[in-house]
A protein has these predicted regions:
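Phosphate/pyrophosphate-binding loops and the adjoining catalytic core of nucleotide-dependent enzymes
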Residues: 2-241
């Protein structure tokens, strides 16, 4: 079972080449410079054409929880990975990162799905306490780095550090029409969709930790000042996701 998982539609879109009607593993279709991150020999490594998954031995992750996304600009990406990778290895925290500059450019391109764009590194904390501690430490480490906003998430403070609640493992449910979709588990054990939208979605059964309550409240209940930014306009529809 893959530890991280994909939006199925996004996964297909990432494997269709320009001017081609066929899906193809991107790693086979085009060679691009790879990102590198050294980990100890007792870490597990899984690789696909977009992501490299890195997991320390004897660390059991929950199926879901609060996860952290880091964004970057192309010129800083390898340096950011060097800094964060070394930090997470010392902490023995599971994470994944984009495998190459090619995958980085595709996920940040204008045709990429907005719900996944901007994500360069995904971090899987083992507990809520670990999650809150990692947010604060990463904010200190990455204060001089730059990256785009991850639309599905909330920014923690000023650094390119973002978070959302969602699945850590590959769980699927059917939507009633026979279509499979990514899922998370409710407290009663039933599955519900893990909504990956180009905006933040808080599952209705999730309690918000005190350490991020201010940021979550500000996103869910925007101030009047924020609403005034859109006052002269009527939003009809999106041109593109």
């Amino acid at each position: 079972m893959r530890h991280g998982y994909h939006n199925l539609t996004n996964y297909r879109m990432l494997h269709i080449a320009k001017d081609s009607p066929f899906f193809e593993e991107y790693a086979q279709a085009k060679n691009t410079e790879s990102f590198s991150c050294e980990v100890p020999s007792d870490w597990a490594c899984q690789l696909d054409s977009t992501w490299r998954y890195l997991f320390p031995a004897k660390v059991n992750l929950p199926d879901q929880g609060w996860k952290i996304h880091l964004s970057s600009c192309p010129t800083e990406a390898q340096l950011l990975l060097d800094v964060v990778g070394g930090f997470l290895v010392k902490k023995r925290v599971a994470f994944k990162h984009l495998v190459s500059y090619g995958s980085f450019l595709r996920l940040n391109g204008k045709n990429a799905n907005r719900s996944s764009s901007g994500k360069f590194i995904t971090i899987y904390p083992g507990s809520v306490g670990d999650f809150l501690a990692l947010l604060e430490e990463l904010e200190g480490l990455l204060g001089n780095f730059h990256g785009p906003y991850v639309l599905s998430d909330i920014r923690y403070k000023e650094a390119p550090v973002f978070f959302r609640y969602g699945g850590f493992r590959y769980l699927l449910e059917e939507d009633g029409k026979g279509v499979s979709r990514l899922a998370i588990r409710r407290p009663d054990g039933s599955l519900t969709e893990d909504q990956r939208k180009p905006f933040f979605v808080l599952p209705d059964f999730v309690s918000v930790p005190f350490g991020i309550k201010k940021q979550v409240d500000a996103r869910i209940n925007p101030s009047d000042e924020f609403e005034l930014l859109f006052a002269p306009y009527s939003i009809l529809e999106s041109l593109h996701f």
